[in-house]
Amino acid sequence: MTPDLLWAPFGEFAFMRRALLGGVALACSAGPLGVFLILRRMSLMGDAIAHGILPGAALAFWLFGLSLPALTAGGLVAGLGMAGAAAWVTRRTGLREDASLAALYPISLASGVLLLGLAGRKLDLLHLLFGSALAVDTATLYGMLGTALFSLAVLALSYRALALDSLDPLFLRSISRFGPLAHAAFLTLVVLNLVIGFQAIGALMVVGLMMLPAAAARFWSRRLLILLPLAALIGAVCVWLGLVLSFYASLPSGPCIVLLAGAFYLFSLVAGPVNGLLRSTPFPITV
């Protein structure tokens, strides 16, 4: 495939340019968040919250139709509510947070599907779960760009607190009272990116764009300051190539993007210089 073929769809079609800009913006903010989720051993939280936003989005659709602000607000409230409920259960019962999320997300998913059925209005459930990056309109694009800029700004301003909270939360709590605040801000960013992403590539596919580049980057560096931009870069390249593959092969865009990210993860798992299968010496992550 020549370089012209790789860029031609974006020069010719406005919807391809919107899909590329929105997807790259989402990759640049979701990838670093995925790195922190892996460091916190909360990798499945993204998947659980992605299911958890469905009832909020379904209720918003029932009440307001296909309104971007309503869907965003509904998904955000549902996602934050689910994360807060899981944290409350953990504090009150001692159950691990991932176990609490695993118990809550099937309830949320079933509630969302039931609400869509009760609404009696036509909305393709597959589109809600798997989305279409090629259907990104101008309003959604602005939402994705704004979310990415906000997320990156918060990550830059709170990097030290997030790094300490991920690598040694007890130490952070011993020297500062802002440990719970950093954790809450991080969860808010995760939910916000999942909510804005599900409108473009679906509630389930956005988890792949958040976690797979982060997991792949883990095999190429052990420094956190390198892992964060590397995950964003891997995600952005996968968005670009996935959209090109989707365009020429007439395939769904979301799965193409995620499968390319998965292929690079498998390659990194085998050939990565840090803890890859071809290496015998493990390396810890350092700040």
Predicted segments, located by residue:
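Membrane-interfacial amphipathic/re-entrant helices at transmembrane-helix boundaries
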Residues: 1-28
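Membrane-interface helix termini and inter-helical loops of multi-pass transporters
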Residues: 2-12, 122-136, 244-247
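Loop-to-transmembrane alpha-helix initiation sites
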Residues: 22, 68-77, 98-102, 145, ...
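Short loop segments and helix-boundary regions at transmembrane helix junctions
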Residues: 35-50, 54-122, 217-229, 246-249, ...
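Small-residue-rich segments of transmembrane alpha-helices in multi-pass membrane proteins
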Residues: 51-60, 103-115, 135-136, 179-190, ...
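Helix-loop-helix "hairpin" substructures at the membrane interface of multi-pass membrane proteins
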Residues: 140-213
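Transmembrane alpha-helical segments in multi-pass inner-membrane proteins
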Residues: 204-255
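Cytosolic-side transmembrane-helix boundaries in multi-pass membrane proteins
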Residues: 251-287
